[in-house]
C-alpha cells in the first residue's frame, strides 16, 4: 500500500471510529483468544466461585474461557495440555494437576498453577499457612483439645496442605492433638457421601471437640453433630445455606483470579514477572459454630 493509500485508510479509521475485529487481531498475532481453565470438578463450591471471577477477569482482556473439567482423570488432563501444546489455547490456568511434574515442566506454553507446586510453573494461591495459624488460634481460644482436620485427597505437593501443617504446629505447641483424615474427591463434592463419611468419623473419634473441614463437609458435620466446634475452610456460599452460619477461613477467590490472570497475560505477552509466586491473604468470617 502506498503512503497516500495508508493515509486514506488512517483517515477513514479515525472518522468511522473503527475498532478492528478481535478475531482479526488474534489471527495477526497468531493467537486464538482462548484461555483454558482446568478444574477438578466445576460442582465444587470454591472452584465454581473462582471460575466465575476468572471468566470476568479474562473478559476484560478480550479472552474467551473454556472450562476443562478433569474430574481427577489423568487422561483428560493430558488431553487439555495437548490442546495447549497444539496452540488451540493461548494459555492455561490449572486448578487440577495430577500428572507428574516432568510432564508440566516439558510444556513451553503459558501456564499458571493455583495450588500444585510445580518447578518452573508460576503459582498463585491463598496463604494457607496463614489460614492454618488462624484456625489453630481460634480452636485454642475456644478451648478445643482434640481437633480433626481434613487433608487433600491427593498426594501431590499442594500449597493448600500448608493449612493442615500450620494447624498442627499451633496446636502441638500447646499440647493439643490434631487428627488428620482425608476425604476422597467424590466425598468432597457429593453431600450424601460426605454425610455418610462424617457419621463414620464421629463414631470413630467421639472425643473430638473441634473440626476443620472444607465447606460442604463442614455443613455435613453441622447437620450430624451440633455439640462440636466447627470451622469451614474456603468460606463459600455453602457456609450460609444452613440454619447456622458456619465460622469460616475465607479464601479471596476474586483476588486469586485477578492475580493469576495478570500473571498469565504477562506470560502470553512475553513480559517478565516480578515474582513467580503470589500468596493471597485469607480472612476469618465469624459465624455461630465455634
PLM regions: where:
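Flexible loop/turn connectors
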Residues: 199, 204-212, 217-290
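Glycosyltransferases and closely related glycan-assembly transferases
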Residues: 103-109, 168-173, 221-229
Amino acid at each position: 500500500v502506498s503512503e497516500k493509500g495508508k493515509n486514506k485508510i488512517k483517515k477513514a479509521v479515525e472518522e468511522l471510529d473503527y475498532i478492528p475485529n478481535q478475531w482479526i487481531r488474534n489471527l495477526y498475532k497468531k493467537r486464538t483468544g482462548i484461555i483454558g481453565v482446568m478444574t477438578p470438578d466445576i460442582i465444587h463450591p470454591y472452584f465454581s466461585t473462582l471460575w466465575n471471577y476468572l471468566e470476568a477477569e479474562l473478559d476484560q482482556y478480550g479472552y474467551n474461557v473454556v472450562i476443562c473439567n478433569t474430574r481427577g482423570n489423568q487422561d483428560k488432563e493430558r488431553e487439555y495440555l495437548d490442546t495447549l501444546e497444539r496452540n488451540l489455547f493461548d494459555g492455561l490456568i490449572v486448578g487440577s494437576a495430577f500428572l507428574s511434574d516432568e510432564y508440566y515442566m516439558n510444556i513451553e506454553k503459558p501456564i499458571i498453577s493455583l495450588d500444585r507446586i510445580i518447578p518452573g510453573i508460576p503459582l498463585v494461591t491463598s496463604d494457607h499457612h496463614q489460614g492454618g495459624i488462624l484456625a489453630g488460634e481460634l480452636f485454642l481460644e475456644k478451648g478445643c483439645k482434640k481437633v480433626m482436620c481434613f487433608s487433600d485427597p491427593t498426594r501431590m505437593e499442594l500449597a493448600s496442605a500448608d493449612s493442615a501443617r500450620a494447624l498442627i504446629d499451633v496446636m502441638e505447641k500447646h499440647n493439643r492433638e490434631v487428627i488428620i483424615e482425608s476425604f476422597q474427591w467424590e466425598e468432597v463434592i457429593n453431600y450424601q457421601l460426605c454425610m455418610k463419611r462424617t457419621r463414620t468419623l464421629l463414631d470413630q473419634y467421639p472425643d473430638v471437640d473441634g473440626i476443620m473441614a472444607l465447606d460442604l463437609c463442614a455443613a455435613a458435620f453441622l447437620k450430624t453433630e451440633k455439640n462440636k466446634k466447627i470451622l469451614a475452610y474456603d468460606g463459600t456460599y455453602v457456609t450460609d445455606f444452613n440454619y447456622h452460619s458456619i465460622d469460616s477461613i475465607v479464601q479471596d477467590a476474586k483476588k486469586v483470579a485477578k492475580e493469576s490472570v495478570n500473571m498469565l497475560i504477562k506470560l502470553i505477552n512475553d513480559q517478565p514477572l516480578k515474582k513467580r509466586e503470589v500468596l493471597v491473604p485469607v480472612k476469618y468470617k465469624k459465624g455461630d459454630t465455634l
